[in-house]
C-alpha cells in the first residue's frame, strides 16, 4: 500500500512539474504590418509585434534567422514595438515572425507574417472573357499576361477577400470562375512573379459586373479551382483579425489537465483504500474463523482429557474396592 501511494505521489509531482515547465513558455505574440503587407518596391513598411504588458524585449526573425531587436518605450502601449523597414526590396520580402521576453522567459513564436514586394517587373495585362458584364450563372475567365516570362501569376480582388488566387504559367495564366454569383462582382488586378513574395507591378483594374434577376442559391462553380473559397496564399493583414488571446486558452487547458490529474489520483486512492479495507476485512474474518476453529478444537481436546481422567479415576476406585473384581 505504502509503495503504491509513494508511486502515485511521485507521478503527480512529475506531471505537475511538466505542466509548470510548459507554463513557463509565454503565450505567442501578435504580428502585423502597416500600412499593408503588399509594399511597393522602395517604399517603407512598419512591422508591429505585440506581447504581454511585462515584455522587456522583442526580437524579429526573417526566414528563420534573427533580423532585429527592439525594447518597448515607456508609454501607454508598452506591450508592443515597431520594427521599421525603410526600403522594401526582394531581399526583405518573405516570412517574418517575432518573439518577446518577460523576466527570464521567452514567448512562443508568433504566427508567420508574409510580406510581399510589388513593382519589380513589367506591368501585366488583365482582361476577362467573354466580357466584363455578365449575367448571373455565366462562366467567365480572367486572363493575365506578362511580356517577361515568369513562373506564377496572382489574381487579387480589391477590398474583398484577404486571399488571392494563383496559377502557374510562362507569359499568361487563366483564372476560370463560374457559374458566377453576386459574390464574384468587384474590381480585380493581377500580378506576375518568380516567387510568392516578389511580384510585378499591378495590372490595370478590371471590374466584373453581375446583372440579372434573383440569384439562384443552387448555383455552384463547376471548376473546383474557380471557387472564391479556393485560395493558396494567405494575405491576412487585419490587425484586429489577428488579435487572439491565446493566454486564456493556455490557462484553461492547464487547469483542465490539473483537474483531470487530480481526479485520476483521487479515484486511484479511493480504489486502493477500498482494496485495502476489503483485504483487512477478509483477513479479520479469516482470523475469526481460525480462532473459532481453534477454540472448538481446544474444547474437544479438553473434553477428551477430562473424560479420560474420569475414566482413569473410575478404574482406580474399582481396583481399590475389595472384591470389586
Curated annotation (Swiss-Prot):
UniProt cross-references to Pfam families, sorted A to Z: ig, Ig_2
Function: Cytotoxicity-activating receptor that may contribute to the increased efficiency of activated natural killer (NK) cells to mediate tumor cell lysis.
Protein name: Natural cytotoxicity triggering receptor 1
Tissue: Selectively expressed by NK cells.
Cytoplasmic side: 274-325
GO BP terms, alphabetized: defense response to virus; detection of virus
KW Glycoprotein (keyword) present: yes
S-S pairs: 49-98, 144-190
TM regions (residue ranges): 256-273
Subcellular location, record wording: Cell membrane
Signal sequence annotation: 1-16
Species of origin: Mus musculus
Quaternary assembly: Interacts with CD3Z and FCER1G.
Keyword Transmembrane: yes
Extracellular topology ranges: 17-255
Membrane-topology annotation of the record: Single-pass type I membrane protein
Residues of this chain annotated as glycosylated in UniProt: 139, 216, 238
Similarity field: Belongs to the natural cytotoxicity receptor (NCR) family.
InterPro entries (UniProt xref): Ig-like_dom_sf, Ig-like_fold, Ig-like_Receptors_ImmuneReg, Ig_sub, Immunoglobulin_dom
Cellular component, GO, one term: cell surface
Ig-like domain boundaries: 34-118, 129-211
Keywords recorded for this protein, A-Z: Cell membrane, Disulfide bond, Glycoprotein, Immunoglobulin domain, Membrane, Receptor, Repeat, Signal, Transmembrane, Transmembrane helix
Amino acid at each position: 500500500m505504502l509503495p503504491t501511494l509513494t508511486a502515485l505521489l511521485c507521478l503527480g509531482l512529475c506531471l505537475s512539474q511538466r505542466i509548470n515547465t510548459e507554463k513557463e513558455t509565454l503565450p505567442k505574440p501578435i504580428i502585423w504590418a502597416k500600412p499593408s503587407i503588399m509594399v511597393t518596391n522602395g517604399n517603407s513598411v512598419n512591422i508591429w509585434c505585440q506581447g504581454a504588458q511585462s515584455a522587456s524585449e522583442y526580437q524579429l526573425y526573417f526566414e528563420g534567422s534573427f533580423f532585429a531587436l527592439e525594447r518597448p518605450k515607456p508609454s501607454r502601449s508598452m506591450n508592443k514595438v515597431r520594427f521599421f523597414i525603410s526600403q522594401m526590396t526582394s531581399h526583405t520580402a518573405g516570412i517574418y515572425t517575432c518573439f518577446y521576453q518577460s523576466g527570464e522567459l521567452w514567448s512562443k513564436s508568433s504566427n508567420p507574417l508574409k510580406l510581399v514586394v510589388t513593382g519589380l517587373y513589367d506591368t501585366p495585362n488583365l482582361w476577362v472573357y467573354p466580357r466584363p458584364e455578365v449575367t448571373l450563372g455565366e462562366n467567365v475567365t480572367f486572363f493575365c499576361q506578362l511580356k517577361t516570362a515568369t513562373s506564377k501569376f496572382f489574381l487579387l480582388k480589391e477590398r474583398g477577400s484577404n486571399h488571392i488566387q494563383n496559377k502557374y504559367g510562362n507569359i499568361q495564366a487563366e483564372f476560370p470562375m463560374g457559374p458566377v454569383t453576386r459574390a464574384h462582382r468587384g474590381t480585380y488586378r493581377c500580378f506576375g512573379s518568380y516567387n510568392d513574395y516578389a511580384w510585378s507591378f499591378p495590372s490595370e483594374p478590371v471590374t466584373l459586373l453581375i446583372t440579372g434577376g434573383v440569384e439562384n442559391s443552387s448555383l455552384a462553380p463547376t471548376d473546383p479551382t474557380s471557387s472564391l473559397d479556393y485560395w493558396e496564399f494567405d494575405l491576412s493583414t487585419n490587425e484586429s483579425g489577428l488579435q487572439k488571446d491565446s493566454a486564456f486558452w493556455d490557462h484553461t487547458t492547464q487547469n483542465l489537465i490539473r483537474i483531470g490529474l487530480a481526479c485520476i489520483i483521487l479515484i486511484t486512492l479511493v480504489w486502493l483504500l477500498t482494496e485495502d479495507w476489503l483485504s483487512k476485512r477478509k483477513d479479520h474474518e479469516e482470523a475469526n474463523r481460525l480462532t473459532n476453529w481453534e477454540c472448538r478444537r481446544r474444547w474437544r481436546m479438553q473434553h477428551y482429557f477430562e473424560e479420560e481422567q474420569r475414566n482413569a479415576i473410575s478404574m482406580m476406585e474399582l481396583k481399590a474396592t475389595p472384591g470389586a473384581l
